[in-house]
C-alpha cells in the first residue's frame, strides 16, 4: 500500500470513529417520596431527579446505558422509538427481550442511536410508567435538512437558524399524574369492579398543580356534543371533571362481576383538593437563531390525550414520532399517550410571558394543564397573549379549530413523511386481523378477540430466547409470526366485541418498526383482503402519502359504531416486538400482543452477556 493510500485510510477511519463515538450513560432507579404537583406520594426517581434526565446523542453513536435497580421492585427500561436494529436484546420489554431487572441488580443496554429525531425512554414493567420513570431522548441527525426548513421559509438565514434551533431544542415532557401509585391505582379498579381513570394533574417537566375550578365550570368545559352523543341525558362530571364511574357507557358490559363503587376511595372520582405548586417555565431568547425556537414534546401520559398551544404563537409541526414530516402550520395539536412531536416557533410577538395550555382533550376527564413560555428578560412581566384553547381543551373560535391538528382519521391527518417514503401498493404478503376491546370485565382488554396479555407473560423465558415456547398452547393466541422481507398489514377492529360497543380511543404502539396507516373506515371488516377493501372503498385508503409513525390513535366509538384501521410495515428487523395500547390501564388489563418479526431469520448470535443464566 502506498503512503498516500495509507494516509487516506487513516483519515477515513478517523472521521468514521469521530462520528460514531461510544457514549456511556448510568441510570440509578430509586423510590422515594416527592410532590410534583404539591401533594406528596411515593414515586420513581432516576439519578435523583424526576422526570428522568434528558439523553442527547448523535446519530449512529454506540450507546451503553447501565441501569441500576435500587428499588424494592422490578424494573426495565424501554427505548421508545429506537429501532434496535440487530440489538433486540436491548429493547427493554420483559418477557420478550429480557427478564425484569430485579432489586439490587443491574442491566446494561447496548444499541445504536437510531433513527435520528425526538424519542423517549420509560419503564415497561407492569404499570410503573404511572410512577414516573420517563425521560426525553434527542438523537441529532447526520443529514442535511435544508429541504425541510425551506418549506417553512426560503430565507437562507432562517434556514440556518432553524437548523441550529432544532439541534438544541427545548424539551417538554408532558405527563398525567395521580395521587396514587400504580399498584394502588390498579387495585382500585380490581377491588371496585370498575375501570377507574380519574387523574389529578397534568405535569410539564415534572411540575404542575391541582386545580379545582368548580363543578359548574368543568361541566361547561365539556366538549360540545359529548354528553348528547355518548352519555345519558343529564350526565354531569364531578368536581374533578370525571364522569360517574358506574356509567354503562364508560364501563361496558353487562359483565358477570360485582360492581362495588363504594370501594373507590375518597378523592379518586370526586372531592377535589387544590394545591398551589409551580408550573414549568420555558425561557426563550428571540435574539438567538433569528428568533426561531424548536420544542420537543413527549406525551409521557398514561391515560390522557394531550393538546398543546402557546398563546398568540403559531407553530410549524415538523416531526412526529422521530419521523420528519412536511411541515404544516397550526395553533394547537393533539397528541396521544406515547407520541412525540417537534415544532418550530417564530418568536415574533411582543416580548413577555405567554401561557402554554396543555390540557387533557380526551373524553376521559376535563383536566387543565399549564406552563409558561417567557421571552428572556421578561420574567417579571405580566402574562399576555391570545388563548387558542380553553381550560378543557376546546378551541376558542372556529378559526382555531380549522387551524388545529387532529390525528384521528385520514381526512384530518395530512402529515406525510419528509423526504417522501411510502409503502408498497396493492396487497401485502401477510394480513392479520386484530379485534380490540373488553372481555369479561371493564378493566380486561384484548387485542385478539379474547386473549389477555398477562403482565408477567414469558418473564422467566423471554421469547427472544424461546421463540417457540407458546406453540401448541393457548398462549399462542398472544403471538403473531411474520417472515423476514415480507410486507405485513395489521387490521385493527374496534367496537365489535359483546359489551364493548362504546369504545374509547386506543393509542397503539409497535416496538421494532414504524408503520404506515394506509386505511381507516367505519363498520365491520368483512373483506377477504386489504386489496379488496381498497377496490370497494378507495376513499378510505391512502397509499401515496400516508403517515409513518410508531404510535397511532384509533377512533372513539360513539353509539356503538364500529371502526377499523389498517397499518402496513416491512419486516427487516427480526426479533420479538410488543404491539400494545399505550394507555397503562389497557396494557395492564391485557391489551398487547407479541409480534415475532422475521422468524425465518431469527437472531442466532446473542452476545454472551445477554444469555440467560
Curated annotation (Swiss-Prot):
Gene ablation phenotype (knockout): Reduces significantly the conidial yields.
Enzyme Commission (EC) number: 1.10.3.-
A single GO molecular function term of this UniProt record: copper ion binding
Compartment list: Cell surface
Induction: Highly expressed during conidiation. A conserved conidiation regulatory pathway containing BrlA, AbaA and WetA regulates expression. During conidiation BlrA up-regulates AbaA, which in turn controls WetA. Moreover, the Hog1 MAPK regulates fungal conidiation by controlling the conidiation regulatory pathway, and that all three pigmentation genes Pks1, EthD and Mlac1 exercise feedback regulation of conidiation.
Keywords: Copper, Glycoprotein, Metal-binding, Oxidoreductase, Repeat, Signal
A Pfam family it matches: Cu-oxidase
General function of this protein: Laccase; part of the Pks1 gene cluster that mediates the biosynthesis of an anthraquinone derivative pigment that contributes to conidial pigmentation that provides protection from UV radiation, heat and cold stress. The polyketide synthase Pks1 produces 1-acetyl-2,4,6,8-tetrahydroxy-9,10-anthraquinone though condensation of acetyl-CoA with malonyl-CoA. The dehydratase EthD and the laccase Mlac1 further convert the anthraquinone derivative into the final conidial pigment.
Pathway: Pigment biosynthesis
EC top class named in words: oxidoreductase
Annotated Cu cation 3 binding sites: 124, 511, 580
Residues involved in Cu cation 2 binding: 80, 122, 582
Lineage summary: Eukaryota, Fungi, Dikarya, Ascomycota, Pezizomycotina
List of glycosylated residues: 74, 256, 279, 444, 468, 484, 526
Signal peptide limits: 1-20
Binding site for Cu cation 1: 78, 509
Protein name stated in the entry: Laccase 1
Cofactor: Cu cation
Residues the record lists as binding Cu cation 4: 506, 509, 581, 586
Organism: Metarhizium robertsii (strain ARSEF 23 / ATCC MYA-3075) (Metarhizium anisopliae (strain ARSEF 23))
Cofactor mode of binding and number, as noted: Binds 4 Cu cations per monomer.
GO cellular component term, pick one: cell surface
Domain (Plastocyanin-like): residue spans on this chain: 29-142, 171-359, 468-598
Family assignment from sequence similarity: Belongs to the multicopper oxidase family.
Amino acid at each position: 500500500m502506498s503512503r498516500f493510500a495509507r494516509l487516506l485510510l487513516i483519515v477515513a477511519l478517523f472521521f468514521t470513529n469521530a462520528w460514531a463515538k461510544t457514549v456511556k450513560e448510568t441510570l440509578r432507579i430509586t423510590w422515594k417520596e416527592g410532590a410534583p404537583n404539591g401533594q406528596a406520594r411515593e414515586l420513581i426517581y432516576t439519578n435523583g431527579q424526576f422526570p428522568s434526565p434528558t439523553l442527547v446523542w448523535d446519530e449512529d453513536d454506540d450507546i451503553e446505558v447501565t441501569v441500576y435497580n435500587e428499588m424494592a421492585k422490578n424494573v426495565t427500561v424501554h427505548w421508545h422509538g429506537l429501532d434496535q436494529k440487530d440489538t433486540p436484546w436491548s429493547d427493554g420489554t420483559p418477557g420478550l427481550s429480557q427478564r425484569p431487572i430485579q432489586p439490587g441488580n443491574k442491566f446494561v443496554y447496548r444499541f445504536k442511536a437510531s433513527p435520528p429525531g425526538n424519542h423517549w425512554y420509560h419503564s415497561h414493567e407492569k404499570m410503573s410508567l404511572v410512577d414516573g420513570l420517563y425521560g426525553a431522548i434527542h438523537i441529532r441527525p447526520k443529514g442535511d435538512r435544508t429541504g425541510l426548513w425551506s418549506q417553512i421559509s426560503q430565507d437562507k438565514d432562517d434556514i440556518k437558524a432553524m437548523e441550529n434551533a432544532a439541534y438544541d431544542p427545548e424539551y417538554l415532557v408532558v405527563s398525567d399524574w395521580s395521587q396514587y401509585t400504580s399498584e394502588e391505582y390498579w387495585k382500585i379498579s380490581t377491588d371496585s369492579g370498575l375501570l377507574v381513570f380519574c387523574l389529578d394533574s397534568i405535569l410539564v417537566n415534572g411540575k404542575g398543580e391541582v386545580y379545582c375550578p368548580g363543578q359548574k365550570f368543568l361541566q361547561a368545559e365539556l366538549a360540545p356534543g359529548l354528553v348528547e352523543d355518548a352519555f345519558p341525558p343529564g350526565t354531569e362530571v364531578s368536581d374533578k371533571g370525571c364522569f360517574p364511574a358506574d356509567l354503562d357507557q364508560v364501563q361496558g358490559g353487562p359483565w358477570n362481576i360485582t360492581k362495588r363503587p363504594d370501594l373507590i376511595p375518597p378523592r379518586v372520582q370526586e372531592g377535589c383538593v387544590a394545591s398551589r405548586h409551580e408550573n414549568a417555565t420555558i425561557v426563550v431568547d428571540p435574539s438567538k437563531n433569528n428568533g426561531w425556537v424548536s420544542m420537543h414534546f413527549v406525551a409521557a401520559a398514561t391515560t390522557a390525550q394531550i393538546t398543546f398551544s402557546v398563546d398568540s404563537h403559531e407553530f410549524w409541526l415538523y416531526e412526529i414520532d422521530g419521523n420528519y414530516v412536511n411541515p404544516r402550520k397550526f395553533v394547537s395539536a393533539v397528541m396521544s399517550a406515547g407520541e412525540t412531536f417537534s415544532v418550530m416557533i417564530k418568536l415574533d410577538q411582543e416580548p413577555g410571558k405567554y401561557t402554554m395550555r396543555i390540557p387533557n382533550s380526551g373524553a376521559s376527564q376535563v383536566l387543565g394543564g399549564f406552563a409558561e413560555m417567557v421571552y428572556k428578560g421578561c420574567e417579571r412581566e405580566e402574562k399576555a397573549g391570545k388563548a387558542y384553547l380553553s381550560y378543557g381543551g376546546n378551541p376558542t373560535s372556529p378559526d382555531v379549530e380549522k387551524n388545529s391538528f387532529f390525528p384521528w382519521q385520514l381526512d384530518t391527518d395530512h402529515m406525510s413523511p419528509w423526504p417522501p417514503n411510502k409503502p408498497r401498493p396493492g396487497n401485502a404478503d401477510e394480513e392479520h386481523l386484530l379485534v380490540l376491546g373488553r372481555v369479561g370485565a371493564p378493566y380486561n382488554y384484548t387485542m385478539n378477540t379474547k386473549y389477555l396479555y398477562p403482565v408477567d407473560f414469558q418473564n422467566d423465558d423471554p421469547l427472544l430466547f424461546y421463540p417457540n415456547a407458546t406453540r401448541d398452547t393457548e398462549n399462542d393466541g398472544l403471538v403473531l409470526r411474520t417472515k423476514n422481507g415480507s410486507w405485513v398489514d395489521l387490521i385493527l377492529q374496534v367496537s365489535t366485541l359483546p359489551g364493548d360497543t362504546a369504545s374509547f380511543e386506543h393509542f397503539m404502539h409497535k416496538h421494532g418498526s414504524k408503520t404506515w396507516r394506509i386505511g381507516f373506515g367505519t363498520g365491520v371488516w368483512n373483506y377477504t383482503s386489504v386489496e379488496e377493501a381498497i377496490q370497494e372503498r378507495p376513499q378510505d385508503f391512502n397509499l401515496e402519502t400516508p403517515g409513518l409513525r410508531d404510535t397511532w390513535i384509533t377512533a372513539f366509538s360513539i353509539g356503538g359504531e364500529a371502526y377499523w384501521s389498517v397499518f402496513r410495515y416491512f419486516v427487516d428487523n427480526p426479533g420479538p416486538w410488543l404491539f400494545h395500547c399505550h394507555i397503562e390501564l389497557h396494557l395492564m388489563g391485557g391489551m398487547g400482543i407479541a409480534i415475532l418479526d422475521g422468524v425465518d431469520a431469527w437472531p442466532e448470535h446473542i452476545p454472551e452477556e445477554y444469555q440467560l443464566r
